Structures are given as C-alpha cells and as structure tokens.
Curated annotation (Swiss-Prot):
Binds 2 divalent metal cations per subunit. Magnesium or manganese. GO terms for biological process: riboflavin biosynthetic process. Keywords: Lyase, Magnesium, Manganese, Metal-binding, Riboflavin biosynthesis. GO terms for cellular component: cytosol. This is 3,4-dihydroxy-2-butanone 4-phosphate synthase. It comes from the Bacteria. The lineage of its organism: Bacteria, Pseudomonadati, Pseudomonadota, Gammaproteobacteria, Enterobacterales. The keyword Lyase applies.
Amino acid sequence: MTQNLLDQFGTPKTRVKNAISALRYGHGIIVLDNEDRENEGDLIFSGETMTTEQMALTIRYGSGIVCLCITESKRKQLKLPMMVQNNTSKFGTNFTVTIEAAEGISTGVSAKDRLTTIRAAINDNAKPSDLNRPGHIFPLQAHKNGILGRIGHTEAAIEFVTLAGFKPAGIICELTNRNGTMSKVPDIIKFSKLKKMTIVTIRDLIQYISR
C-alpha cells in the first residue's frame, strides 16, 4: 500500500536522489520506515545545516523528542554512556544519556538552544566537557553496519546525510498529528506536500545502496 501511494513521487531511485539533493541544499526530508515495523515518518535534517527555523518546525509538527543520530566513535569521543545497560526496547533503539550544551544556552529547551547543543556535540573537536548531562537532546548511536545492520530511522539518517556529503550526524523526530496520534502514510504525504518536503522510504534507501 505504501509503495503505491508513493508512486506519485517517482521511482525508488528517484526518491532517494531527490532526498540526497534536498539535504545538500539544506532542506529536510521525510523518511518512512517499513509497514511491518513502526510504519511512521521521521523528519530528517543534517546536523551541519539545520536552522533554528527548521528546528522550530520539527518541534511543532513532531513528537518533541529531537534525536541526534551519531556513530559509536562520536559517542566514545563525547564519553556518553548508554541510557541503559540492558536495552529491552522493541526495536533496540540505542539511546545514550541526554545532553545539553555547557555554554551558549538558557534552559536548553528552545529551538535555538537545542540547535546550539547539537552543534556543540557534532563539532569535530568536541570534548565531553562541552556537554552537560542530562538535557533536551537525545543522542542515538547507529548500528556499526549502518542501515544494513539495523533497518531504523537512526541508521537511515546517518546514511542519507553522508550520501549528501555531510558528517555522520543526523537529526530525527517523528511526525505527529494535531490530535496527538502518530502520523501515518496518508497524513505524512499531505504534510510533505504542504511543506514541500521530499519523501522517501527506508526500503528505497536499502535498494539504492545495495545496487
């Protein structure tokens, strides 16, 4: 059903190329996962290019849980412990402890403050002391084998931003409806047209990198 609804946005290869191009130009994209998984759509941005306005849009239309997708090496660089030692979440989502920039913010919750935290974390020379814990940004460690190791939005974000030429640091947040429910495909397609955002699936991405 999902693939049929997405045919209007081109072939899977076209959708992936459009998504990569959108990210290169500093835009966000919408990524759908599989129908037999979460069956939800996430807003995805590059941590390097995301603007305060884009963060505000993400907070307004998303769940409010803004996540920073990073590699294991970045997590170790920042000395961020995992949120739990025994991960029992359904899809094995690898949350670390939450973070906040140590400098340059007020309460940490505003769009501007959250972006300041992200920039501090993804800086190539970032040190553990640059971040306070806990905070309002939720880092996620991606699988070491990327999207082929785990079919999740975390890994998709890393794959997409690196394909676009950026460092492996992606921002994700689940889209929600006004009534508080999670957005499903028909709602997500309407949103993508309203905000003129490229829409693509994780299945599209896997086909693209496996070609």
